[in-house]
Amino acid sequence: MRLSSPWFFLLLNAAIFQLGWWSLILFANQALVFALLLLCVQLLLVNPGYRSALMADNAGDEHSQLAGQNVKRTGYSMKTFNAVLIPAVIGIALDAMLHLGGVFEFDSPSRLLPLWLCCLWGHFAATLGVSLAWLRDLPKWQQALFGAVGGAGSYLAAFRLEAVAWPLGQSATFSLLILIWSLLLPLLSYCNLRLEWGANRPTKGFL
């Protein structure tokens, strides 16, 4: 697959997220430095300008390469950074409340949310505008369905891998997470879209 293909960035974004997810779930804070380095790569790749520039550089067309160099000179878009930061902060705040409320328990005796989980939220937020951008084109009820299945399912996997404990029991906690994520994923997808593009959203896709 060529670097000039949009699919390259979509698959790379998804692969880095999976690598970050597994490393943080399995090794927690021991994998934090590695996961933060991966997150830095994600923050670069989520910028549409840099993606377009890299695609242009590898297109083999002189005009496209000149256009790519011009895009690089414009620098990093803070809109893109905020489109990752704000959804991540929303997710961190929500998990922190669930932790304080006794829904989640972690190995650390601290009532603060573990750093590895905060980093994981950064990784997830970085997928909203790239490998999960297709959610934007779905009706809200379908976004809610994907949130209920994928979001709650991710927490269930973390529970099964003993990254988190559920003091309230598996059935009650999983039901609560299904409800939360059926509302949360549409909200986060909308926030990411509005923060990055404002009223000038792309008609389809993630570029």
Language model segments and positions:
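Aromatic-rich, lipid-facing transmembrane alpha helices and their immediate juxtamembrane interface loops
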Residues: 1-61, 65, 72-207
